[in-house]
Amino acid sequence: MNRVLISIFFFFFLSFGFAQKGKLISKKVIDMTDTPVWNRVSENNILKPDYIHLEKLDFFSITYQSDSLVIKGILVEPKKEGVYPVVIFNRGGNRDFAPLNLSTIINYTSKLAEQGYVIIGSNYRENDEFGGKELNDVLNLTETVKEIEKGDPNCIGMFGWSRGGIMTYLSLKNSDKIKTAIVGNGVTDLFQLIEDRPKMETAVMAECIPDYWRNKEMELKKRSVIYWPEKLSKQSSLLIISGKNDKRANQNTTTKLVEKLSELKYDYEYQEFITDHFFSNKRNELDQLVLSWFNKRLKYAD
C-alpha cells in the first residue's frame, strides 16, 4: 500500500512540475516616469522625438517559474489590442553585470515592439552557468508566452546580443519552437574568447561554469556553436549581424561559423557593419534590419 501511495505521489509531483514549467507568477506595470530611464528619454517631462514611439507600448516586470526557481524578466506589449508575434530577447553580460533592464529592452527592442511585436526576456537565474542550466530560463519562456493574451505562442522568434548569442545558438540546438533568430555580435567560440580576453576565463568562466578547470574543454565546446552548427534546428532560420570593430566578441570566429553554415546549406544571412560591439553609430540601421528580418521571417512568413 505504501509503495502505491509513493508511486501516486511521485506521479503527481512530476505532473505538477511539468505543468508549472514557465508558469507566469507575476506581471506588474513599470511606470517609466519613476525609473532612471525617464531622464534619458524625456525632456521637460515629455518624451523626446526619438522616443515618442514608447507612448504606444506597455512595459511590465514579470516573474515566472523555471525548474524549481522563480526567475525575473521584462515584458513589452503594444498598447493596441491584438495578438502579436513574440520575440524572446536574450541579454548579454553575466550574473549582475549588464542585467536586462528597461534601458536595455528599450535600446534593442522598443522599435520592433512598436511595429507589432510582443517582447519578452529573462534575467537568468542567480546561479548563472554562462550557457548551462539557465538555458531553461530562456526555453521556458516559450511556455510563459501561452499565458500572455497578446502573444502568439505559435509564432516565436529570438534575438540575442553578445553573450545572448550563446543562449540563442543553444536554444536553436535544443528546441524547434523558434521559427527564426537574430544574433548580434554573438560569441561563437569560447576558446577564442578566453584567448582574446584572459580575464573572461578567471573572472567569468571559472566562477560560473561548474567544475570548470576539470572539464574545461568539454564545457567550452558545449557552449561554442562553432563546434556543432549542424545541430541547429532545421525548422528555424538565422540572421547573424557583426560589427567589424567589435573588441568584445571576435568576429573572425563569426565568419568561420558563417562558412560552416554555408557548407551545411543552413537557412541564414550574414550582415557586416563598420561599427563597435554596441552598434553605437549604426542604431537606426540595426533597428531597420531587425524589423525587416522579423517581418519577413516571422510575422509574414509563409
Q: Language model features by range: what are they?
A:
Residues T35-E81:
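N-terminal cap/lid segment of alpha/beta-hydrolase-fold proteins
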Residues P99-L100, Q192-K231:
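Mobile cap/lid helix-loop segments that gate and shape the active-site cleft of serine hydrolases
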Residues Y108, G121-D152, N281:
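Catalytic nucleophile-loop/oxyanion-hole region of alpha/beta-hydrolase
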Residues R91, R248, T255-D302:
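C-terminal catalytic histidine-bearing segment of alpha/beta-hydrolase fold enzymes
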Residues N140-R197:
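Primarily recognizes the serine-hydrolase "nucleophile elbow" in alpha/beta-hydrolase
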Residues L239-S242, D246:
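Short beta-strand/loop motif that positions the catalytic acidic residue
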Residues G82-Y84, F89-F130:
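Short substrate-entry loop that stabilizes the transition state in hydrolases
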Residues K231-L238, L264-Y266:
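Short, proline-enriched alpha-helix->beta-strand connector loops that line the catalytic pocket
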